[in-house]
Amino acid sequence: MGLAAVGMIFENLRTACRDGGNLQAREKMSLASTFAGLAFTRANVGYVHAIAHQFGGRYHTPHGLANAIVLPHVLRFSANAVTQRLAQLALRARLGDEDEDDEVLAAKFIDAVEQLNRDIGIPTQLDALQEADIPALARAALHEAHTGYPVPRYMTQEQCEELIRRLLPKASAAPSSPAPTRKPAAKKAAAKKLTTKPAATKRSASKA
């Protein structure tokens, strides 16, 4: 069911987002959602949901949006442990050929997920995320994942924090500093000294 869901998502999600009136694409996405739900009800979820739950709890981020933002990062973290399965997903999404190496197909799948996010307007950062919150978010996510989810590769606290930190909003450009108010006065004083020095020299010359 999971494979079928992935195939339908890659075939229909862009169309459904671009053209909400396309009932065929929306019907396929509804079916894909149902299949995916049935699949993870049996196989359970992992770090994507665990981290996304923390974003929802702290920042009220919609769960689907949080999942989409986190997904590519967790896929890259877990890729070496699930290369063959990612390759199967790539084939189902028609992203490559069976004669390609699993590593190549797995990389294509993750790249395609990132491209799909871009195509439908999913942000790459979480605007509400605060640096100070990251340690607590990571601890809560790991507690959730490690007590009930069959994750393919375990994260440490440091690794989870690093992953979440990649989602911090880009720092806004620092505003240009106003010109110091004392500089003109300093320039004026310097100019005054320059004008008085020649006069002093002239007086010295007359005495001689």
Regions found by a protein language model. Give the residues of each.
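Active-site segments that bind and position negatively charged phosphate/pyrophosphate groups
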Residues: M1-A112
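C-terminal charged capping/lid subdomain of soluble metabolic enzymes
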Residues: L86, G96-K188, K192, K197, ...
